[in-house]
Amino acid sequence: MSYQTLFLQQSYRDCTKQYEEILHNPNLPLWDYVVLTASNEAQAQAYRAQISYRLKHQMLPEKTHYAVLPDPDGKRVGSGGATLNVLRYIREHAAGTKSPAVVPSGVVWGDGAVERRQPVSGQPGEAACHAFDGKRILVIHSGGDSKRVPQYSACGKLFSPVPRILPNGRRSTLFDEFMIAMCGVAARMNAGMLVCSGDVLLLFNPLQIDFYGKGAAALSIKEPAEIGKNHGVYRRDREGNVGGFLHKKTVEQLHEMGAVDEHGHVDIDTGAVMMSVDLLNSLYSLIDTEEKFAACVNEQARLSFYADFLYPLASDSTLEQYYQETPEGEFTLELRACREKIWAALHSYQMKLIRMSPAAFIHFGTTRELLHLMTEGMEQFTHLGWQARINTNSQEKSYGAGNSYISLRADVGAGSYIEDSYLHHGTVVGERCVISGVTLDGQSVPADTVLHGLKLQDDRFVVRMYGVCDNPKEAALFGKKIGEPLWTAAVYPIRNTIQEAVSATLRAYEDGFPTLEDGISLKDSFNQADVTAILPWQDKLEDKVKIESLLEAIDKKDNLHEAVKVFNGEINGRVIRQLCGLAEKLDEQELFEFSRKIRIYYALSCLTKQDKYLDLCLDTIRNAILVGAVAGLSYDSTAKMEQEEVVVRLPVRVNWGGGWSDTPPYCMEHGGTVLNAAVKLDGQNPVEAVVKKIPGNQIVLASADSGAEQAFSEISQLQDSSNPYDPFALHKAALIACGIIPYREQISVEEVTKNLGSGLYLSTQVIHIPRGSGLGTSSILAGACVKAIYRMLGKELSQEELYNRVLCMEQIMSTGGGWQDQVGGLAPGIKMVTSDAAIVQEIGCSPCSISTETLQELNERFCLIYSGQRRLARNLLRDIVSRYVSGNPDTVEVLYEIQRIAVLMRFELEKGNVDGFAQLLNQHWELSRRLDGGCTNTCIDMIFSSVEDLIDGKMICGAGGGGFLQVILKKGVTVEQVQKRLREVFQDSGVEVWRCSLVG
């Protein structure tokens, strides 16, 4: 990157930073007035809407007074006439004689109307006499009809897009770039007016500007003479002022006239001119009565700011030559009379030449130039932060796109530019096209075509179509001669919708664009355009693009915290409603729609910072599982108590590999893989469920662990199983899951017990194991209840059915979690437990083929250590699930890796390599810590550290954070040695070894 480019890049950044500061600090120097000129009232309305939008979104300094002035009475009065109209507006506004329209933001607008009052110069008030004193005024002439780029006729070229994201995340426009680039100029002048042309973007450093004197100052930039021959050039006199104006001279002529410096460069006219207060007062003297105003501001004179106001300021100018200067309109007597007065008022002033270098300007000229700028020419402006793709879902580099959704199944040709449009599946756009403001749904657009949609004031639509190289001033369309200039040819059909208008225009193209009786031209469609519809369409499309981009990221399961950045921290009610409406329509029993639904809600929780959307996400997961789980639930009125009493005792489980992969929604989207083992403690199965007959018509539930027992005679009490603080929630869920009582249906307890043949007593306990052990006791206890009830009823139950009943119980209880715990205790031995990706999980259990010798070695080297602390309740499940749903890369990677390690663990055990298994256990421990930093704490770390030299492998049980720890001892190390070490360090604090044995 050259030094010049680096300078401009940093200057651009400095201006952007300064502008952000001005937005938040009104005490910094800023423009007192920003005035835009417009060609007619319709265009003025469009400009006002644009400025109101920016004020509403805090994109403009509120302290500045903004005015949009159309040419008076709708007449084309030229840029000079428009400038005089600005001066009169400011003078009358200062005097309080203007009757402004007030917009909701409280900002006052000029309406451009000529007020028939007594001449202001008659008895001017004090404020009017000094209207320009101390005022910094920015005027942007933007009243053209944009014939050379018709797609911007309605919105105005001034508000045409610039391919840069503003600091607030919105797409920039030429106007926004003006405000940023010129914000520093206000501080470089004490008072006066800066006049700019609305179709040229200047890139410069405001620190190179100083203007505190009388007269005017022209801002120029250095360019090679070869470029200067196509532009206006200033010739500098000996005093450093503008000596003359040279317009589109050859390189030889520029040399002959002394305009070329020793480096072969000329001073390019940028269209930006600064004027002092004295000069403004002199200009105002030309229109200080109604009669004078009418004489100077009219269609006959059609004064040009550049030809009529600046020429007299050049030191080498003459009145005779001034009369011959090419006018903006025609040579008329009215123009000659005005020039005589202007010469007398201005010729005594000088115009300083301010040379800015390094500097550059970008001219938004013709459609072809625009297309080049937005595609192939983009590279030369990337240092300014310009991008070929702005607010679009498309990442294709062969074409440019701004504020557009382009289907992945649409085909866009190289070198094309798509803006403010929606391209559906099957759409084909040829090479080098400009597509603007339309919806294409499967149509084909030929190469080198402009297609631009407009809403008209009667709520109908027109789509204008012409060649990229067509000149609307000429009588040709797509290279074919037509009867009148394209600008006025009524060849475009009008339809009720934009889609119908697209189809009708494409048919007209195929028919050779015949003149239509009810057709409309470029000119008339511009004049009849509903300018108030432009911003809402762009906003609506911007929302649509962001929504579709988010949905694409959701469907790819990308990181949602990155994906939501497309909204730049802002989300409006319309987007929220659309996303919620979309989510509500999705079927959570269909896997793709389920995945999309939960992530839409999660994205909304990120965007709105509201927990209710995260709750909806988690509720959707629970509901999806619950619907599948309770699908087979039914009350069995034929069930009978076949035995007096049934007691079921089960082992606990230890988790080795893959834990968390069994947790919804991960297992639903990817399947789960878990390696675990059933374990006895002190030779006993500690999980117990007892079912027995009791006399009477009651159902009695008991929890030996909590010492609670209660008789129930109301069915509604038994059906309420979702209260996590209810000591009998598990018992109630077991009765529902096994068909003892109905899930929802109302029936009396008396009828239930009558059908059973007696009352029922269900008791549970976990013998001598502390709560929060991490050994899966809650799920295994649920399995014990199901086994006991089915055995009491004399029913056969397969392992798969058993797993499903327990899953059903856990969903009824709303406990969430995965399926590995119950399988760990219900199926004997060491096994690999798996499931495929599906909403309804089908669990497969495959016993590991482990030799007797390996199992014996494991029993000798494996032991459990109680940490002496109960695992604290945490929102762990919510946290892990949220991070997975969000697409957190680290979480997703860990969940994949722990499954891979589970498979490798099985391999090592089946090969008899306990040392290899121990190393994998250590790797899993590190992954568990990555997934959840709360799985360990100072106490757990200290326990592991204290026995580090005695063990080869370590791991937590369950989610960790307390409860039991598991270790693989080094060969030759005994359990007693570990116990002794723990006693030495922790004494009798409860940290100790528990004897255990793997169930074969």
Predicted segments with their positions:
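Intrinsically disordered, low-complexity terminal tails and inter-domain linkers enriched
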Residues: 95-131
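Short helix/loop capping segments that flank catalytic or ligand/cofactor-binding pockets
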Residues: 45-46, 148-150, 204-206, 227-229, ...
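C-terminal nucleotide
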Residues: 519-754, 795, 804-816, 822-956, ...
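DPxDG-like acidic metal-binding loop motif
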Residues: 155, 159-160, 773-795
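N-terminal glycine-rich phosphate-binding loop and ensuing alpha1 helix
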Residues: 2-96, 128-196, 201-211
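Left-handed beta-helix
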Residues: 1-42, 68-69, 82, 87, ...
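Stable alpha-helical structural segments in soluble proteins, enriched in small hydrophobic residues
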Residues: 86, 178, 617, 621-625, ...
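Conserved core of the sugar-phosphate nucleotidyltransferase
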Residues: 134, 153-154, 160-196, 200-297, ...
